[in-house]
From Swiss-Prot:
GO terms for biological process: ribosomal small subunit assembly; translation. It comes from the Bacteria. GO terms for cellular component: cytoplasm; small ribosomal subunit. The keyword Ribosomal protein applies. The keyword Transmembrane does not apply. One of its GO terms (molecular function) is rRNA binding. Protein S19 forms a complex with S13 that binds strongly to the 16S ribosomal RNA. Keywords: Ribonucleoprotein, Ribosomal protein, RNA-binding, rRNA-binding. InterPro entries: Ribosomal_uS19, Ribosomal_uS19_bac-type, Ribosomal_uS19_CS, Ribosomal_uS19_SF. Belongs to the universal ribosomal protein uS19 family. This is Small ribosomal subunit protein uS19. It comes from Chlorobaculum tepidum (strain ATCC 49652 / DSM 12025 / NBRC 103806 / TLS).
Amino acid sequence: MPRSLKKGPFIEFKLEKRILDMNSKGEKKVVKTWSRSSMISPDFVGHTVAVHNGKTHVPVYVTENMVGHKLGEFAPTRLFRGHAGGKAEKGGSAPRKK
């Protein structure tokens, strides 16, 4: 269920303040954050935000297409290594007919 329009988007106060300060100074530094639920606003475009995925901080370069999405969408928390190989890779597992 989406957030009510009456409330407006959630952006962590400290994160928004850092981005606005960097915009006023014209700086481009990597900003670390644990706030995966913060919405990406148009002020974030062009900055790199390091979003925590539970283990490390994943650098996310914000583009115009990302505005309106949440930071956590771009830092996956699970690593998929593929399904088990087994007999299918070695050859046919069905017995041959004579």
